């Protein structure tokens, strides 16, 4: 039976796509790390000793490579897609692209270092970056999220920090958020690797996002979920 519903993602959004329609579309290693996602055309994912991805390889030969510090902090990402190579270096709160300073991250936004201009996030109660405005108040980007972080519509796409303020990588249809301790697939509502703090959450899936309760909780870093507190002034 085929679902006759129209697409649920519009204007820059993303959604789950059953790209191959096979019985086994996902493969995991003995540590529980995702090593293959046929729906995204990912043929292999290799990992380091911290169960962080070293290399993502697509069926057409495109790759995404990661470099980390000893504590697991991401230092570099190299996208090789077709004939184009893009290198992103992370030096504290300064982001370089192909060796050129690009962004200076701040608590409430970022500075584009090519022109020294400030850009500000307008966030919702979950810390999701819903709107980006420049220092004149002009809207540069707007994002509309499903509860689990999928984007059903967006405009602008001027910067990568979106749901929960996490870095989103949509290149080559990867569509993953980097939570630090592990990657998150919002189209599935699941992380790609086992929770390193699994012994604290024995009553839920090791891959579930914030205990399957994205309305009342957020995940801070792939290790720890937190309740959302909303106060009303009487």
What spans do the regions from the language model cover?
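Short turn/helix-capping motifs enriched in Asx and small/polar residues
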Residues: 136-150, 172, 180-182, 186-234
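A cytosolic small-molecule/anion-sensing beta-strand core signal
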Residues: 30, 49, 125, 185-187
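Acidic/glycine-rich beta-solenoid
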Residues: 1-119, 136, 154-162
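Short helix/strand-bridging catalytic loops that position acidic/His residues to coordinate divalent metals
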Residues: 54-55, 165-166, 194-199
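Flexible loop/turn segments at secondary-structure boundaries
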Residues: 44, 54, 63, 130, ...
């Amino acid at each position: 039976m085929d679902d006759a519903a129209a697409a649920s993602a519009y204007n820059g959004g993303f959604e789950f796509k059953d790209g191959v329609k096979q019985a086994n579309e996902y493969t995991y290693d003995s540590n529980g790390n995702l090593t293959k996602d046929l729906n995204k055309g990912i043929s292999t994912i290799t990992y380091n000793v911290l169960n962080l991805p070293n290399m993502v390889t697509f069926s057409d030969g495109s790759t995404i490579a990661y470099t980390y510090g000893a504590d697991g902090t991401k230092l570099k990402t190299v996208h090789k897609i077709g004939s184009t190579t893009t290198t992103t270096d992370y030096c504290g709160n300064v982001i370089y692209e192909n060796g050129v300073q690009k962004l200076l991250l701040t608590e409430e936004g970022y500075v584009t270092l090519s022109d020294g201009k400030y850009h500000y996030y307008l966030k919702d109660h979950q810390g999701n970056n819903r709107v980006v405005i420049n220092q004149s108040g002009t809207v540069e980007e707007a994002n509309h999220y499903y509860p689990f972080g999928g984007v059903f519509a967006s405009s602008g796409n001027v910067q990568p920090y979106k749901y929960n303020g996490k870095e989103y990588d949509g290149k080559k249809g990867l569509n993953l958020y980097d939570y630090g301790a592990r990657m998150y697939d919002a189209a599935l509502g699941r992380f790609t690797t086992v929770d390193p703090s699994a012994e604290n959450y024995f009553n839920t899936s090791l891959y579930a996002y914030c205990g399957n309760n994205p309305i009342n909780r957020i995940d801070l870093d792939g290790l720890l979920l937190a309740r959302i507190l909303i106060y009303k002034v009487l």
